[in-house]
Each structure stands twice: as C-alpha cells, then as structure tokens.
UniProtKB/Swiss-Prot annotation:
Active site: D211, D573
Species name: Oryza sativa subsp. indica (Rice)
UniProt GO cellular component terms: Golgi membrane
Biased composition regions of type Basic and acidic residues, renumbered to the chain: 53-68
Lineage top rank: taxon: Eukaryota
Record protein name field: Probable mixed-linked glucan synthase 3
Alphabetical list of InterPro entries matching this protein: Cellulose_synth (IPR005150), Nucleotide-diphossugar_trans (IPR029044)
Lineage: Eukaryota, Viridiplantae, Streptophyta, Embryophyta, Tracheophyta
Family: Belongs to the glycosyltransferase 2 family. Plant cellulose synthase-like F subfamily.
Amino acid sequence: MASPASVAGGGEDSNGCSSLIDPLLVSRTSSIGGAERKAAGGGGGGAKGKHWAAADKGERRAAKECGGEDGRRPLLFRSYRVKGSLLHPYRALIFARLIAVLLFFGWRIRHNNSDIMWFWTMSVAGDVWFGFSWLLNQLPKFNPVKTIPDLTALRQYCDLADGSYRLPGIDVFVTTADPIDEPVLYTMNCVLSILAADYPVDRSACYLSDDSGALILYEALVETAKFATLWVPFCRKHCIEPRSPESYFELEAPSYTGSAQEEFKNDSRIVHLEYDEFKVRLEALPETIRKRSDVYNSMKTDQGAPNATWMANGTQWPGTWIEPIENHRKGHHAGIVKVVLDHPIRGHNLSLKDSTGNNLNFNATDVRIPMLVYVSRGKNPNYDHNKKAGALNAQLRASALLSNAQFIINFDCDHYINNSQALRAAICFMLDQREGDNTAFVQFPQRFDNVDPKDRYGNHNRVFFDGTMLALNGLQGPSYLGTGCMFRRLALYGIDPPHWRQDNITPESSKFGNSILLLESVLEALNQDRFATPSPVNDIFVNELEMVVSASFDKETDWGKGVGYIYDIATEDIVTGFRIHGQGWRSMYCTMEHDAFCGTAPINLTERLHQIVRWSGGSLEMFFSHNNPLIGGRRLQPLQRVSYLNMTIYPVTSLFILLYAISPVMWLIPDEVYIQRPFTRYVVYLLMIILMIHMIGWLEIKWAGITWLDYWRNEQFFMIGSTSAYPTAVLHMVVNLLTKKGIHFRVTSKQTTADTNDKFADLYEMRWVPMLIPTMVVLVANIGAIGVAIGKMAVYMGVWTIAQKRHAIMGLLFNMWVMFLLYPFALAIMGRWAKRPIILVVLLPIIFVIVALVYVATHILLANIIPF
C-alpha cells in the first residue's frame, strides 16, 4: 500500500507550499464547500476506505523493480477496486433481483385478472419498462474503479532540478452567456482561481468566452488582470486554498500552511481590502461605461453612430452596445479576440497596477501571471450560433492560434478551482504510462458550495457523481459532464487514438475551415510532445483570430459534427463524450481528497427543474439522432454502449411513474378496485422487488462512500422530476419530432449573495410554471386519497373482512410512500413557511381528518338520499 502522500498527492509546490494532504489543510476542509460530504463518510478521494483495495500492486511493483530504466513514464495514479466481500454480494443481489423481476413478469402475464383491464395493461407495460431501465442502469455498475492521482510521482517526473518542467501546456476555457443571469463577480472569481492555480505560468493560458459580446465583461476582465497581480503572488507566497477570493474570504478561520506566517496576517488584511475595492470597481462598471459613452457621444464626432458604446481607449466597442443597433446587438456583432495578458515570456501588455505598491514583499515569489484572453465569437442572425458548443469551438480555434496547448480544460463561469493542484491531478492521467496516450479526457466530480445544508433538491447528486461515475470508470470511462473536464486537443479534433490512428494525417480545410494558421496549428498539435511559445500578436494575426471566431467560419466544415464539441443538441457534453468514446478513446474519473472544483447550483425548485428539462430533453434528442447509442459509436465497449443507452431513454420512465402516482384517485370509487388479482400476492411481489433494489442501493452506498440521506434525496428528487421535468422533456421531444424545433436553451439564473442577506433566499421562493401542475395534482390526489381511505375505514370498519382491511392498509402505505417522496415539493409550496417544517407535520394530519370527515358526511348524506 502506498503512503498517504503518494495516494492523495503530496510533495511541495514551487513556492514551498505543503502538500494537500497536510493535516492542517485537510482538517480545515470542514469550513469550505464539500466538507460536510467528506465528514459524512464519502467523497471523492477516500482511497483507503475499508471497502476499497489497491488494484495495481503488481504494476507498481514491476515499475519499482525497473526503476525507470526502460525510459517509460512512471505510474502517475493509483487504482482501487471494491473488495470482494462487498462486490460479490452486490453482484449476486443484482442477479437475484433480475430473476425475481422475470418471475414477477411471468406471474402477472399468467394472472391477467384486474378490475380495470386497460390499467392492468398499462401497468404491465410500465413494470416491463421499469425492469428494462433498471437493468440498463445496473449492468454498467458491475466493476467500479476509483482512480487517485499521484502528485508526488508527477512532481518527481516533471519538476526538474534546474527549475524547468516537463509538464505539457494547458488551455483553460471559461464560458459565460450573459452578465445578468451569470453575475460578473462569479465569472471573475473563476478566472482568478485559474490564474492562481499551481501550474507553470508559461505552460497555461486562460480564455474567457463572452457570448453576450458585452463591454462590461471585457473591462471586468481587465480589472481582474490588475487585481491578479496582487492576488496570484499572495496565493503562491502563502499557499492558500481555495484560490477564489470570494470563497477564501468567506472562511471563518482559514488554516495556514505557508512558510511566512508572521507576514500572513498583514498581507491578508491588505489583499482583503484590495479585493473589496476590486468588487466596488466591478459593480461600478455599468455606470462607468454608460457615462463614458455619453461623454464621447456628446462630442458629436464623425465616428459612427451617435449612441455607440465606447471603450476606455476612446474607440467604439465592436460588440454589443448599451443601446443596441444592427451589427452591435446581442446575437449580431463581430467576433472579438483581445489578449488581456500576453504570454509571460514577453511580459504583460497592460499598464497594470504594481502589486509592490501595497507594501507586500514578493521577493521570493514568482509574480508572473498566465496568458489571459477575451473571446467573443461573432454572431449573425443568418447563422446558427450553436449555443455553448459553438462558444467552446470558437475558443478551441482561437487558442489553437495563440497557445495551441496539448490539453484543454473547460469551466462554466460559476465554477472555480477549489484545489490548486487540480490541473496537475488531471495531467497525472494523461501522462501515465498505462493508458495515458489513449485517454481523451479526464472528468472531475461536480461539487457545490451554495447548496442548503439538507440538500432539499438533491443538487449534490452524489449517487451519480460518487456511484455511477466510479462504475463507468471501470468500463471505457465516465461521460463528459460539461464542466471540470480536461480534454486532449487531438481527441476534440476528431483524431483517432494511437492504436487506430493513420500515419501522415493531413488536416483539410473542408474539415477544419479555411485558415492556413489553424491548419498549421493542427499539424503542430499532432506532435504531442512539443511545447510552442505563442507567436507575437500583430495586426495580421489579430485579423486571423477574428476570422476563426466569426459567425460563418464553421459553415460547411466538420466543426460541430466530427470536430470539436457537437452541435444541434441540448446536451452537447454527453454527445461530445459519446463521439470521442465511439472512436475508441477512453476517459478517466479523477477524485481528490480535497475537492478539485466547486461551483454554484440552482437551489430554487423551478430553476432546478428547468435545468433538468434541458438535460433530459437533450438525452431524448440524442436517442432520436444519428448519435443513438444503438447504432453509433463503432468502437464502444458493450457495457459502455448500455450506459449511454440508459442516459438517452431514462426520461420515458417518468410516464409510468406518473401513472402509478396518480392511481390513488381510485380511492374515490365507492367499490373496491384492484389493479391486479390476487392482490395480496401482487403486493408481496412488489415489496420483495422494492426491498431488493434498496438492498442493492445499500451496498452501493457502502462502496460509494455516501450516506442514506444522499440516497433518499436522490429518490425524492427523482419522483419530483418524474412528475414534472421528465414528462415535460418527453412532450418537448414529441413536439421536436413533429416540428423539428429543438429544446430551448435557457441559462440557469444564479443568485448572488449580494442580492440578499439570506444565502438560501432562492430556496424559499416558489415560482409557479406549468410543468409543476402534474406534481401538484399527484400531491393533492394522494392527500385526498389518504383522507378518503381514513373515511372509508371509519365507515366500513365493521363491514370489511380481514383481507379488505389488509388491502386498504397496503394501499394506504403506498399513498404515504408517495407523500414522503414528494415532501421536498410540499416544502417548496410553503415558501418561507418551510423554514418551520413542523407546520407541515401538523397541517397534513388536520387535512387528512378534514377530508375524512367530508367523506363520512357525504357518505351519510348520500345513503339517506340514495339507498344502497
């Protein structure tokens, strides 16, 4: 077994910082995002958990005996598999449940006896679908694998004694769509965390894609570059974590792991004051830009339109104007590429504020900052802009001309680097001697630091991130999840993995577009070991940059099809990963003890459901496209194909769940109505199958390192989604098939803490939308059914047989189960009253009693009028 340092990633960075397995730093994670999950027994990197065993002892022993004399790269990550004492019972239960499900199907077909035959037919179809979808979900989970980067080995291999590095280049992409829905402060904190990451400054570059073309984001990026001259050296000098200033300064008592503790308190105070001033400048930007533009426009010069938006250098902004006109509005403007910070080897090209003026001593600290570039792709109503995928492809082309790094990692603007070693961690998998050359991308789990403590709407989704994704890691690899994922540039270009790759590949303009510099960059990228210093940026080069991000550049090329991120689908991430896996590449799942990245999640129910509609609708779009897992992906492994098939059809399950969830209205029928006879045996079968699936879930909880609360929240939100978002997605898909109109892309609104003193204010705001109607109907139907059931029991208690009473209790338990699953939705309806959930606990029994009394009174009244 390896030492803790080699498992979690140890050693010291270039500034003498302690590794991230240092006890002080690990203990302090209780104050930051993700700590509660870790404390609960899960999370990410717990490789030494009692249910996991090292799976690569033989490989490591052989590598140690060789001592690196064969010239091969070292082993840079550790692999762990679930111990047989847990894995074998887990697999056995899956087979046992499969047999039980088949026996249940056979029994139902033989006993086609029901009071409502059409409902029986639909319920049998539903049960068959439940069994099929469960099997698709379960089969890929037979061999979970946890992979942990070995940062110590990476440093020994890549950080040379003379201060140079073997590390490859990384281009970091950040995408934002709108400065209103996605607050500028979030975006700039993301950029700052990237600039301060522990990676050689001359081997990384950051590209911000602004899909709105707004001047405020460019000028905010300039302000961020100025503040970075203070923030980045401060992070390096004092080894702070996390390196997003907003998150760092929210910590009540951050632990210190640097080597200049005497200076830390004073430095931290100065930087905090500078950060507060930085935020004030960001908040003032809209008014600053407006006033400046008014001044220039009032001069009545002969330059352009009278209501132009002006930059600080006295030129008109080529993007979206405050008062939009043709060619200067959102959705119609020229492409823009501006190098805010040039490559460190040439120095920075801005008159940036000198951090030494703040009385901070950075003499022993590297004060250089990575390259920083603003990109706003051109938009034109005559061309489809292809949403996020189009923005990423524009960044991919612009970065190819500027830095052309071998690897690319992308972030949504509301995420930030929470662990400064994260970029190095991903590189461990890309450079490993075993599967490194065949690894197309490394996906990290998504973690969130703005979620309410009880995670009402299952935002952490740990059943998926710590369960399903580890299972896929044992196959061809996890799917791409849209953010926090490092790609090999060649894989995005549609190049096959080494085993399948042809010799002498010649990039063609029909595939990559009509840009000589871009085609040359593709040839350079094929030489994977080469690191090239970016060319100087002159006027001719700028024109070429603006051409490759123009609205029409990828027209009649392979961009969005066989090259880059995939177009014409709402879930461009899943389909892009599918296309790459289909070429024979594999992917890896990187878990770290200290979460690599953190972000914000929609804690408002309506916003969360809108997000689910887009994801699930995009999954259905994938099924009805040429990327259908049944026919696409010629080199997909069989179980990897099964997992992708499950990702594309899971929303259909909601139709049958909705059918069952609404069935309690049958309590309103005076006579007894049974879906299946004999009813008792039917219920016993159901209970056995349900019990077995929860036993399997219990074993998954064990090896995934999650809690019962995580599992239960997943069940609850799946029920809420199955009565709202998933049926809506199915309806959208039907409309799409009939009208050829795709799923509408809607940017998820983010709440800033500055908007209110209550961090979780959005949680208690109920925004009614039509998709919530079915959920409300199900909730009311089950509340009414429970009340009617109580009333019926009061009326017929002396008449019913023991079997009838038993059947009534069984039906009542089903109603209660649905109510428990919809509990978060009931809290959402209560709004701010949900802060006192005891109100719901008291209110529901009162409603049950009222409904029961109404039923009894109605029964007595009708009995006197209409004799039975």
